[in-house]
Amino acid sequence: MTAVGTPLDYTHVGMYELGKALTRPTRGKAITGLLRIFGGIPAPVVRTAYRATAWQREVRKPAYILRNADDPNALARMQAIDRFQQTMPGYPGKVSEEMWENFVYHGELARGELHFGDRVLDLTAITQPIQLFGSHRDAIAAWPAAHHGVDLFRGSERVEFMTVDASHLG
């Protein structure tokens, strides 16, 4: 099993911790309610959020273009990320609700116990080898959030973690 830039413990992702703190009086239901009203997270909101988390990239983009004007590979990577961000889909209603409530607010993913109706998936019981990747430059899945898998997948015969030098989108 492989996980690339996957936040396995959302307590290490600042924007989610802020959301939890702000909605604590409603036990997280304020965000769940908004997700239901909007049918999930609309694509323009997802796109704006991804760009906002990498605001430094946006500010530095003109200098990056000038610095790499003679490097077609660097410019192609930048354009690929821009195209990806411009076409990002939204998150559908039920999926976004489950992710918010179970993964983020209640921390099920971090504990390794996912609830799907009457079923419980115990991630700590996975025995297959696992390869994880994380980056200190990832604004979406902070390095500690991705590295959490080293402790989480304790039933695996082998868990390897590799730190890469890249943003969440490459």
Specify the residue positions occupied by each region the protein language model found.
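Short beta-strand/loop motif that positions the catalytic acidic residue
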Residues: 126, 132-134, 138
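Alpha/beta-hydrolase-fold enzymes
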Residues: 1-94
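Conserved alpha/beta-hydrolase "acid-adjacent" motif
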Residues: 139-145
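Active-site nucleophile elbow and catalytic-triad environment of alpha/beta-hydrolase enzymes
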Residues: 104-122
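Catalytic histidine neighborhood in serine/cysteine hydrolases
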Residues: 146, 151-169
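Short acidic (Asp/Glu) and glycine-rich catalytic loops that position anionic groups and cofactors
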Residues: 75-82, 128, 163-166
